Amino acid sequence: MSRPTVSLIVLAAGQGTRMNSDLPKVLHRVGAAPMLHHALRAGQSLEPERVVVVAGHGAEQVARAARAFDETVEVVVQAEQLGTAHAVAQAAPLLADAPGEVVVLYGDTPFIRPETLERMIEMRARHAVVVLGFEAADPGRYGRLVTRGEDLDRIVEWKDATDEERAITLCNSGVICAETHLLFSLVSEVGNANAAGEYYLTDVVALARAKGLSAGVAICDEAETLGVNTRAQLAAAEAEFQRRARAAALEDGVTLTAPDTVFFALDTFLGRDAIVGPNVVFGPGVTVESGAEIRAFCHLEGCHISRGATVGPFARLRPGAELAEDVHVGNFVEIKNAVLDEGVKVGHLTYLGDAHVGEHTNIGAGTVTCNYDGVNKHRTEIGAHAFIGSDTMLVAPVSVGARAMTASGSVITEDVPAEALAVGRARQVTKPGLATRLMEMFRAARDASKKGTN
């Protein structure tokens, strides 16, 4: 059976007053990515034809973040935050003629699973409106879902519920799915005759039932519905994201020697049989291929690590770092916007930025590519099978040819031809006996100084 055409609406207009922040709530990060990206990524699993983000507070920032995730995302602005139904209505001019289904998600609810959304779409074959519910450990003031089997009879707000209805633990998440034309028709009928004077999306269930249409409930784990309204909830969301990411990595065949100390980003990819040591942090945009090893206390972002490579301990890989197979990057090494070909070894205490290093080249301890002149960045090219001596300063732009060598302590300011040895340091001068005479002179000066102060 073919998948129906789907559109996606993500509500992202809330100010998030309780976050006590100038940043729009949906742009606070979980797993090194805005919460909005989590919602968009979950919705992506439905292969939506169109995606509309409803922005409000900080609309320009929200729009930039949405389009950074997917440049085809459309953004509309809810100038006044008058409730969730009012927010959905802002998408009507864009989607009113869209075929198929529409799913409404929330930009501050980052943990809805793709399989949950798939289940909602499947249930749409049996119900005009499908609501996502969850069994709450502490139902508190959540809206209650009054059901008969999977059929939803009504949604009752806590303040309006009887004691019997308050005993219900099946609660409303707010996520909803319906045929596109029907949803916008129902939304247009929602009123605001309530204490808050807002237009609530949940009212579409009662409106649908009044028309003789069926409503259903898809049930998910409570953790999927975790919303973020405070900094404490943001911290809880981060903890839940990391718990899930660690469990998924282990399930996928990755070795985590101390799982609770490894931190993932939303888009971290680790291949099977990769090994990750303790206290490793993955920022955005990291791919680690099968069989690679990341040792303790490394920080990685925007980099690609190929099969058999080893990184760390105490290494930092920054955006643009590309490590080919069997590369070794050791302790206290920083790589930025640099490509290291197969078998390159960078043992320790080195900075390689804006560089390309050919295969099987050895980079000695203390090597620095001096890539910045105070205004512009410049590139360093190092050929294959070269040997860069310890404490070499490579003042870019500069190149070192294949199988060339640089002497330890050299400052290389000119290109080094293939197979040449470059020495760029002052000649050593040795003065026999001078060390002893100097120490005697220094001690005499010190003693004279002490007598002068008495």
Curated annotation (Swiss-Prot):
The keyword Nucleotidyltransferase applies. Keywords: Acyltransferase, Cell shape, Cell wall biogenesis/degradation, Cytoplasm, Magnesium, Metal-binding, Multifunctional enzyme, Nucleotidyltransferase, Peptidoglycan synthesis, Repeat, Transferase. GO terms for cellular component: cytoplasm; membrane. Gene3D superfamilies: Hexapeptide repeat proteins, Spore Coat Polysaccharide Biosynthesis Protein SpsA, Chain A. Residues 232-252 are annotated as: Linker. Its EC number is 2.7.7.23, 2.3.1.157. It is found in: Cytoplasm. Residues 1-231 are annotated as: Pyrophosphorylase. Acetyl-CoA binds at A365, N371, Y372, S390, S408, R425. Mg(2+) binds at D108, N229. Pathway: Nucleotide-sugar biosynthesis; UDP-N-acetyl-alpha-D-glucosamine biosynthesis; N-acetyl-alpha-D-glucosamine 1-phosphate from alpha-D-glucosamine 6-phosphate (route II): step 2/2; Nucleotide-sugar biosynthesis; UDP-N-acetyl-alpha-D-glucosamine biosynthesis; UDP-N-acetyl-alpha-D-glucosamine from N-acetyl-alpha-D-glucosamine 1-phosphate: step 1/1; Bacterial outer membrane biogenesis; LPS lipid A biosynthesis. The active site is at H348. It comes from the Bacteria. Pfam families: NTP_transf_3. Residues 253-454 are annotated as: N-acetyltransferase. Catalyzes the last two sequential reactions in the de novo biosynthetic pathway for UDP-N-acetylglucosamine (UDP-GlcNAc). The C-terminal domain catalyzes the transfer of acetyl group from acetyl coenzyme A to glucosamine-1-phosphate (GlcN-1-P) to produce N-acetylglucosamine-1-phosphate (GlcNAc-1-P), which is converted into UDP-GlcNAc by the transfer of uridine 5-monophosphate (from uridine 5-triphosphate), a reaction catalyzed by the N-terminal domain. HAMAP family: GlmU. This is Bifunctional protein GlmU. It comes from Cereibacter sphaeroides (strain ATCC 17025 / ATH 2.4.3) (Rhodobacter sphaeroides). The lineage of its organism: Bacteria, Pseudomonadati, Pseudomonadota, Alphaproteobacteria, Rhodobacterales.
